[in-house]
Design a protein with these regions (language model features):
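Register position in tetratricopeptide repeats
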Residues: 41-42, 75, 104-108, 140-141, ...
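Short helix-capping/linker turns of helical repeat alpha-solenoids
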Residues: 61, 93-94, 125-126, 158-159, ...
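Canonical tetratricopeptide repeat
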Residues: 67-68, 100, 133, 166, ...
């Protein structure tokens, strides 16, 4: 799974909500915002949390900072607090918080809620990356019918072959060898390294040790161009098993 990047800063909010009254002067507000920016630049997480909490206390309807606070709690894996503040940010019109809470629910393995919010966000912002997360959530729920539908959408624009590989895995698990092979090969054509490992196992499972060995060796060559040591290990182990079985 590709690592998800939560938007921390420089977010253009399409709706910031109505600001409540604050006793803080304009100058004090500007000063606090600069302090927050400096804390981000220095990656001073403790100070950043303190400052944003202070800001939110003064401006409880500022959707941008509500979302920022939620992101901080997400990065701390304090999911209950993150959920609370994302929901407040959403109530006040921050659309990015919808995507962020969808990711939060994915991390919590609450896949139904994750899908719900990703689909809601998709209606507002046409971001193809959402397709991948929706597909992944369905996959984790073992709902292959919907997972395949969304991975097929991703495959149309994705360049690395990840989705094609996932499609191959699902079709193979369903016993559809023809479709599995088709999608593994499509994944390899885009250069996805793990598809080589899956093709190795695919042909080994068919008893075609020569073809399995061919894919294992090709995969090992590919791993020389990557830093994926685990894949290299698995391919070498697979090759060893294949050779011993001959």
């Amino acid at each position: 799974m590709k690592k998800y990047l939560i938007l921390l800063l420089v977010i253009t909010n399409l709706g910031l909500g109505v600001q409540s009254f604050s006793a803080m002067t304009k100058e004090e507000k500007t000063k606090l915002e600069k302090q927050i920016d400096n804390a981000y630049e220095k990656n001073d997480k403790k100070k950043l949390e303190t400052l944003i909490i202070k800001y939110v206390a003064e401006f409880p309807n500022n959707a941008d900072y509500l979302n920022r606070l939620a992101v901080l709690y997400t990065n701390q894996k304090n999911y209950s607090e993150a959920e609370k503040w994302y929901l407040k940010a959403i109530e006040n019109g921050n659309f990015t918080a919808i995507s962020n809470i969808a990711y939060l629910y994915f991390e919590k393995k609450d896949y139904e809620k994750s899908i719900k919010y990703y689909k809601e966000y998709q209606k507002l912002v046409d971001n193809p990356d959402n397709y991948l997360w929706i597909a992944a959530a369905y996959y984790e729920m073992d709902d292959y019918k919907n997972a395949k539908e969304w991975y097929l959408k991703v495959a149309k624009f994705e360049k690395d072959g990840f989705s094609e590989n996932k499609l191959g895995v699902m079709f193979e698990e369903e016993g559809n060898q023809k479709e599995a092979l088709k999608w593994y090969q499509a994944s390899v054509e885009k250069g996805y390294p793990w598809a080589y490992y899956n093709l190795t196992n695919f042909y080994a499972g068919l008893g075609d040790s020569d073809t399995a060995e061919k894919w294992a060796r090709k995969g090992i060559e590919i791993t020389k161009k990557t830093d994926d040591e685990s894949l290299k290990k698995y391919l070498k182990e697979a090759l060893d098993v294949i050779q011993k079985a001959k």
